[in-house]
Every structure is written in C-alpha cells, then in structure tokens.
Amino acid sequence: MAMYFPISLLLLLLIRVSSEIPTFTGSLIVVLVFALFGLNSNTFPSSLSFSCLLISLFMLYTMSIILLPFLRFRGAYWVVLLTFTVLLTFLTFLIFLFDCLFFPLEVGLLSEANSACQFEERAIKTVRYLLY
C-alpha cells in the first residue's frame, strides 16, 4: 500500500503542473505501465525502473515546453510528442521486462550467492530459449 503513495503523488503533481494534454496523456501512459508491471503484492519496483520512469516523465514534460514554440502546426506537435511517448513507454516496458526476468526481488529468502546462481541459471535458460 505504501508503494501507491509515490504514484498518486506523482499523478497529482502532473495534473497540477501539466497544461498540455499530450504531455499529461504520455505521462499517464508511462505511469500506468509502471503501475501494471512494477507494482503487485509480492514485488517492489527496482530503483532502475523508478529512475527510468522519472526520467521519462521529465523528458515528456520538457519536450512539450521546448517543442511547442517551434512547431507551426498543432498536428505536428501531436505527432512528435506521440512518437516520443510511444518510444519512452516501450523503453520503460523493456526495462520492467528485464527486471522481471533477471532481477526479481526476493526479500529475505535468498543469500547473495544463491541469488547470483539463480541469475546465472535464468540467463542460461533465457539464452537457450531464444536460441531454440
């Protein structure tokens, strides 16, 4: 339950500071991807995933401020922002997928050595699966 607090706080901040609809939509997509893949009852988001999320949101908001004066047509602004939003969302999804495959957080169950062995086993299984 405590992990939902930063997300709700981030959403409130986005609603407050965002004046552009595409920026808010793109940020909301990234937050939803974060909520779906990074939060459940058994795992917590890793610092890498959370950092990627914050960087993506910052880039979306900054892009909307920088690009708006330079684009003459409103449609071009939407296309550029939508393209970057899709790319950032896909990047975030890949990082979450990478976290889920290789770096699961198993609190208090495994020692560091056992965790390293499991990491190697998972990597070998993944490579075998991809090759065959």
Swiss-Prot record:
One CC-aspect GO term: membrane
Residues in compartment: Extracellular: 40-49, 99-132
Disulfide-bond pairs as recorded: none
Keyword Transmembrane helix (UniProt): yes
Membrane topology (Cytoplasmic): 1-18, 71-77
Transmembrane segments: 19-39, 50-70, 78-98
Domain of life: Eukaryota
Localization annotation: Membrane
The entry's keywords: Membrane, Transmembrane, Transmembrane helix
Recorded topology in the membrane: Multi-pass membrane protein
Main localisation: membrane
Key word ATP-binding present: no
Other known facts: Almost completely overlaps REX4.
Entry protein name: Putative uncharacterized membrane protein YOL079W
